[in-house]
Swiss-Prot record:
It comes from Ciona intestinalis. The gene is Ci-bg-crystallin. This is Beta/gamma-crystallin. Residues 64-84 are annotated as: Disordered. SUPFAM superfamilies: gamma-Crystallin-like (SSF49695). Residues 2-42, 43-84 form the Beta/gamma crystallin 'Greek key' domain.
């Protein structure tokens, strides 16, 4: 089982959302299009710009991603996350 932590602001600031399962629509958690930094504690995750695991995606392995450029994405774009 993996774990990913999404943050509202760059450098791991603001509200955070900890997940251990895939989420097809981050709006359910109030986190649609607001993610600006990520910590992957374990597992491999794909983050997607659109709901339903669609649109541009980025593969993330354990580590810290302090801003969208660190995973190759854009600020405030993520809408779904999927654990591999």
């Amino acid at each position: 089982m993996g774990k990913i932590i999404l943050f509202e602001d760059v450098e791991f600031g603001g509200k955070k959302l900890e997940l251990e399962t895939s989420v097809s629509d981050l709006n359910v958690h109030g986190f649609n299009d607001i993610v600006s930094s990520i910590i992957v504690e374990s597992g491999t995750w794909f983050v997607f710009d659109d709901e339903g695991f669609s649109g541009p995606s980025y593969k993330l392995t354990p580590g810290k991603y302090p801003n969208p450029g660190s995973w190759g994405g854009n600020d405030d774009e993520l809408s779904s996350v999927k654990q591999q």
